[in-house]
Amino acid sequence: MGCNILMGTDSSAIGKELCSNDVVRKIHLTGSTEVGRILMRQCSDQIKKVSLELGGNAPFIVFDDADIDEAVAGAMISNYINADQTCVCANRMYVQENIYEEFSKKLAEATRAMKVGNGFDDGVTTGPLIDQQALEKVEEHIEDAVSKGASILS
């Protein structure tokens, strides 16, 4: 069984071709629910096999028996790998109440220690967001969370 990963600037044209071409027997997408709906609809004419991994709703859970330092290290990777622009990044954290203060303090310290910049520069630990749209999406998520009672740790 083979796998092909296609990249290009006209994703709509690529998607339409893959979904309508008889040579392609199955489509797999890891991506947004919006794009998943489009591809599923386009594949339905041929009753093409489709598997979809959608939404990126990955919680990071810390129980009270966890090694806090290891949990913080894991949270940093899970939240900030590739500037938090992958489908496997955690989008929320659940921490048991009796360890919340210690965990959140250490997580805030680790986050403050990050250096954002060009990945080729010394000391840089994470790159910038990919574009203005990505920045605006992050800002919207922050505003939404705060409006629902979340606190920003600094």
Q: For each predicted feature, which ranges?
A:
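Surface-exposed charged/polar residues within alpha-helices that form helix-capping/stabilizing sites
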Residues: 16-17, 140
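Short hydrophobic/charged patches on amphipathic alpha-helices used for structural packing
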Residues: 15-16, 72
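Short, surface-exposed connector motifs at secondary-structure boundaries
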Residues: 1, 19-26
